[in-house]
Design a protein with these regions (language model features):
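C-terminal structural segment of proteins
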Residues: 1-194
Length: 194
């Protein structure tokens, strides 16, 4: 995958596209089937906007924040299930995270900057596959799995293999176990000096 930081441009470079606002995962799957490869997903939009500003063409933009299932955090069978469109801020303040993964909530408050935490999504952070993004290493440490869905069905991929998978679909959620003995911390003091 391409590093998002390499994209540059202005709003005048954004070509025309059709915007779709589905309200269910089934509707997203129907749209992707209809469009073939002529679509792009957008959740928080931080990376997608940079790609569009760089002139990357897209015919159909599928906005995912209108799908409730992608914006939820819930406990399912001793696992925390986080929808792909949950923002970093919503994740760090969610009662299920604060109660069951306090250290993780504290670490999440240190990710990126406030703009990234407010707008950026868990799924976007993972799928961007950028070495400078922090979610993937945290979810690797948690032995998380990623849930995908398309018109043919649903499947899970270990978070370790998400960026290597050849089977693409809609990332619906990230799921990780509750209550083991892991302790999380983040040290931002070792930033490179310029």
């Amino acid at each position: 995958m391409t590093e998002m930081a390499s994209f540059q441009g202005t709003y005048s470079n954004i070509s025309s596209f059709d915007l779709h606002r589905p309200t269910s995962i089934a509707e997203v799957c129907e749209l992707t089937t209809r469009f073939g490869e002529n679509y792009m997903f957008m959740g928080g939009g931080l990376d997608v906007l940079q790609m569009l500003k760089s002139g990357m063409p897209v015919e159909n933009l599928i906005y995912l924040k209108t799908v409730p299932e992608l914006n939820s955090v819930e406990i399912v069978s001793n696992m925390i299930r986080v929808g792909a469109c949950v923002t970093h801020h919503a994740f760090e303040i969610h009662p299920a995270i604060l109660k069951n993964a306090t250290d993780l909530a504290h670490v999440w408050k240190q990710l990126g900057n406030i703009r990234i935490r407010i707008a950026g999504t868990i799924g976007g952070n993972i799928l961007a596959n950028s070495a400078s993004y922090d979610a993937l290493p945290a979810f690797l440490a948690l032995d998380a799995v990623a849930h995908f869905e398309d018109s043919k069905g649903s499947w899970c991929v270990s978070i370790e293999n998400v960026t290597k998978t050849k089977q693409f679909g809609l990332l619906t959620a990230i799921e990780f176990p509750i209550g083991d003995a892991r302790v999380f911390s983040m040290d931002r003091s070792l930033k490179p000096v310029t």
